[in-house]
Curated annotation (Swiss-Prot):
The keyword Transcription does not apply. S-adenosyl-L-methionine binds at N37, V39, G64, E85, D115, N134. It holds the Pfam family RrnaAD. It catalyses: adenosine(1518)/adenosine(1519) in 16S rRNA + 4 S-adenosyl-L-methionine = N(6)-dimethyladenosine(1518)/N(6)-dimethyladenosine(1519) in 16S rRNA + 4 S-adenosyl-L-homocysteine + 4 H(+). Belongs to the class I-like SAM-binding methyltransferase superfamily. rRNA adenine N(6)-methyltransferase family. RsmA subfamily. This is Ribosomal RNA small subunit methyltransferase A. Gene3D superfamilies: Ribosomal RNA adenine dimethylase-like, domain 2, Vaccinia Virus protein VP39. Its EC number is 2.1.1.182. It comes from Mycobacterium leprae (strain TN).
């Protein structure tokens, strides 16, 4: 039987009652300190996978697989999955769950019992092409930014996060939700919201709605993507939003060395010094850095191509 997502139904997905059995078997309780809210609704995980558009050519990175609801749906599409799980009990049980729910899909799964923020490129033998996850609430933004920076091979991201986090990630300059996460995520690619997710599809039921967010990395980045350049841009973003109600001229005084130099650098980047940091786009921050360190557009394009 074929589904609209292009996946073939060969794996039995987890249901709520099975998750309750697993809780009893493992004698575990969701830990708020780890942001654990487990998705148990099959239609929701199918929706996430459909939004991600992953297929058998993809190597997917999943963060916080929990009991394996989303993991099974990803394997059902034919993708290979590397699941990063900080909870040793859940990490140890996941391969058995996959084996119990499928015929021969376990060979496409690897499980890493690690903190996602310490996960590095060298920890994987194969470069991931996609990130698909129900991100733990407590590390959603840092995990997302860390993995995009650490794994440039990731071309698409599809994640469930708290609704208010989803709004911040996809916010436009000048909006009430626009902030550091919005700007930094847009450094890597185009961000869009893909709908809301009801609290009732999780156990335990959270007090807030979740949102589905998709990121498509730029096919050709408009700016350099090396670590040094990214850190410099992000430094400017942090400065601007630490003092978001100040004019850009005043916010960047310490960075530029003086008020006059701050204004000169902003004007050189075609930015009105009276604008507030909360109105600046990622393009503005990149242009400000380029003009300030003496890079011209030709040099930047050359660096991007190398």
């Amino acid at each position: 039987m074929q589904r609209k997502s292009g996946c073939t139904l060969t794996i039995r997905l987890l249901e709520r009652t099975e998750i309750r059995w697993l809780v009893k078997e493992l004698e575990c309780r969701p830990r708020k300190s780890l942001g654990q809210n487990f998705v148990h609704d099959a239609n929701t995980v199918r929706r996430v996978v459909s939004t991600s558009r992953v297929n058998r050519s993809d190597f997917v990175l999943e963060v916080g697989p929990g009991f394996g609801s989303l993991t099974l749906a990803l394997l059902d599409c034919g993708a290979a999955v590397s699941a990063i799980e900080i909870d040793p009990v859940l990490a140890g049980r996941l391969p058995q769950t996959v084996a119990e729910h499928s015929n021969n899909e376990i060979h496409r799964l690897t499980v890493c019992n690690r903190d996602v923020l310490s996960f590095r490129r060298g920890d994987l033998a194969t470069e991931p092409t996609a990130l698909v996850a129900n991100l733990p609430y407590n590390v959603a933004v840092p995990a997302l930014l860390h993995l995009l920076a650490e794994f440039p091979s990731i071309r698409t991201v599809t994640v469930m996060v708290q609704a208010e986090v989803a709004e911040r990630l996809a916010a436009e300059p000048g909006g009430k939700d626009y902030g550091v996460p919005s700007v930094k995520l847009s450094f890597f690619g185009r961000v869009r919201r893909c709908g809301m997710v009801s609290p009732t599809v999780f156990w335990p039921i959270p007090r807030v709605y979740s949102g589905l967010v998709r990121v498509d990395r730029y096919a050709t980045s408009p700016w350099p993507t090396d670590d040094a350049f990214r850190r410099q841009v992000f430094e400017l973003v942090d400065i601007a939003f630490t003092q978001r109600r100040k004019t850009s001229r005043n916010a960047f005084v310490k960075w530029a060395g003086s008020s006059n130099e701050s204004a000169n650098r902003l004007l050189a980047a075609s930015i009105d010094p009276a604008r507030r940091g909360e109105t600046l786009s990622i393009d503005d921050f990149v242009r400000l850095l380029r003009r300030s360190d003496g890079r011209d557009d030709a040099a930047v394009r050359s660096a991007s191509a190398s």
